[in-house]
C-alpha cells in the first residue's frame, strides 16, 4: 500500500493485517503512524524499514523510527553512510542500523528480499524485489533510466511499483541521467 509518493515524501507498506515492513520513511513518523492506524496497525506491527536511497523525501522519519520506535533500518553500507553524512542521524541510528549487500538475497519475517541498482543522483540507489506469500513485488523509486536487471525483475513480478518524476526543465538543466 502506498502511504505517500512524490517529492514531498515516499513511504510504502508491504505486509498483511498482522505484520509488515515499510519501504522508505520520507514522511513524518506521526503521519506514518496515522496511516498504519487507518489499517488497524501500529509500529509494533512493523518489522523493519527498507531504505531505497539517502534523499530526504525517502528518509525523513528514519531518525525517529530508529531512536524512539526502535525499528531496524535496513540499507546498504553506502546508503547508511550517506544518511549519516548528509543528515547527521548517526547517533539516533546507532543501534538500529542493519546492513545488506546489494544483489545478495536475505530474509525478513518470511519475505525473501533482493536489491538491484537504480539510476539516480544519490550516494547509492536500490530497488527491491520481495517474494512474499507466493507473490513477487518489485519497487523502484526515483528511476533515472531502466537497466537490464530491473527489466528482468519487471517480467517476473506480480506487483510493480515504479516511481519517477518527469520535469523537462530539471532534466535539461540538471545532472540527472
Residue ranges of model-derived segments:
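Conserved beta-strand hairpin/beta-sheet module of binuclear metal-dependent hydrolase folds
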Residues: 1-39, 124-142
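Short, well-ordered alpha-helix to beta-strand connector turns
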Residues: 46, 94, 157-158
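Cap/insert and terminal regions of metallo-dependent hydrolase folds
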Residues: 148-177
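Active-site neighborhood of phospho(di)ester-bond hydrolases with catalytic His/Asp-centered motifs
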Residues: 23-26, 46-54, 74-77, 138-141, ...
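Active-site glycine-rich loop that binds ribose-phosphate moieties when present
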Residues: 115, 122, 139-148
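Active-site metal-binding motif and surrounding structural segment of the metallo-beta-lactamase
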Residues: 30-75
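Metallo-beta-lactamase
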Residues: 77-127, 131-134
Amino acid at each position: 500500500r502506498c502511504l505517500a509518493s512524490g517529492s514531498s515524501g515516499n513511504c510504502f507498506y508491504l505486509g498483511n493485517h498482522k505484520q509488515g515492513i515499510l519501504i522508505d520513511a520520507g514522511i513524518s513518523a506521526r503521519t506514518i503512524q496515522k496511516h498504519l492506524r487507518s489499517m488497524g496497525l501500529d509500529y509494533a506491527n512493523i518489522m523493519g524499514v527498507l531504505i531505497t536511497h539517502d534523499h530526504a523525501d525517502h528518509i525523513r522519519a528514519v531518525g525517529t523510527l530508529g531512536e524512539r520506535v526502535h525499528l531496524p533500518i535496513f540499507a546498504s553500507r553506502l546508503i547508511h553512510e550517506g544518511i549519516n553524512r548528509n543528515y547527521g542521524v548517526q547517533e539516533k541510528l546507532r543501534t538500529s542500523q542493519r546492513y545488506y549487500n546489494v544483489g545478495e538475497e536475505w530474509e525478513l519475517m518470511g519475505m525473501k528480499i533482493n536489491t538491484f541498482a537504480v539510476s539516480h543522483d544519490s550516494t547509492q540507489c536500490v530497488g527491491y524485489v520481495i517474494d512474499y506469500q507466493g507473490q513477487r513485488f518489485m519497487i523502484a523509486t526515483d528511476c533515472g533510466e531502466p537497466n537490464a536487471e530491473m527489466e528482468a525483475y519487471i517480467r517476473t513480478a506480480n506487483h510493480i511499483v515504479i516511481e519517477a518524476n518527469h520535469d523537462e526543465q530539471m532534466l535539461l538543466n540538471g545532472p540527472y541521467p
